[in-house]
């Protein structure tokens, strides 16, 4: 259920795998995405299971309506009955409020400054990397008092550069913005390494305490992958501060 987790000075990070939930094929088992065609009741149950496994109150988790952009929402509570905004990063200065990001190949980016009590979760796919969602999230954190030098960053399971095949023109366009994303597949064709691009951006922003998951979602049967399966579930990354 919780494939990876880490705690640093009261900052908590967790990434799910696909097991331990109640969703049926092709979303088996722990699908946390509410917009992929799965039974809404199963998604709600899965979100409760994952939150409780992490020791988080399911009612204190903030989700996003992710659209592959660079918009950021600053939050101090869950959305409740309000519409969930179309953003790809959420930032909070509310300790104990968990932020969640959904992925199935894109890079889940979790950030926290334990001193200021500011945290962020961002969804960085190819478009978001180019649009600058990660710098936007770090800037929003800084506006709330975070210091990039204190930020702890964790990126979760994502499709790797050996597997993320793209047309040559697309690789060139992305590499023109972020050279670190330039990659080649294991079979010698153009590819992108979005995780490498994210970490390069974080380094330039002054975020040095970083760790990257070794898991490639396309290669791992324990994780959802849109590129591999198309119709499938979504993983989640969670971050919160004591």
From Swiss-Prot:
Reactions performed catalytically: adenosine + phosphate = alpha-D-ribose 1-phosphate + adenine; S-methyl-5'-thioadenosine + phosphate = 5-(methylsulfanyl)-alpha-D-ribose 1-phosphate + adenine; inosine + phosphate = alpha-D-ribose 1-phosphate + hypoxanthine; adenosine + H2O + H(+) = inosine + NH4(+)
Cofactor(s) needed by this chain: Cu(2+); Zn(2+)
Single Gene Ontology MF annotation: oxidoreductase activity
Entry-linked PANTHER family: PURINE NUCLEOSIDE PHOSPHORYLASE LACC1 (PTHR30616:SF2), UNCHARACTERIZED PROTEIN YFIH (PTHR30616)
Pfam families: Cu-oxidase_4 (PF02578)
Family the UniProt entry places it in: Belongs to the purine nucleoside phosphorylase YfiH/LACC1 family.
Residues that coordinate or bind Zn(2+): 68, 106, 123
Subunit description: Homodimer.
Official protein name in the record: Purine nucleoside phosphorylase SCO2081
Function of the molecule: Purine nucleoside enzyme that catalyzes the phosphorolysis of adenosine and inosine nucleosides, yielding D-ribose 1-phosphate and the respective free bases, adenine and hypoxanthine. Also catalyzes the phosphorolysis of S-methyl-5'-thioadenosine into adenine and S-methyl-5-thio-alpha-D-ribose 1-phosphate. Also has adenosine deaminase activity.
Species assigned in the record: Streptomyces coelicolor (strain ATCC BAA-471 / A3(2) / M145)
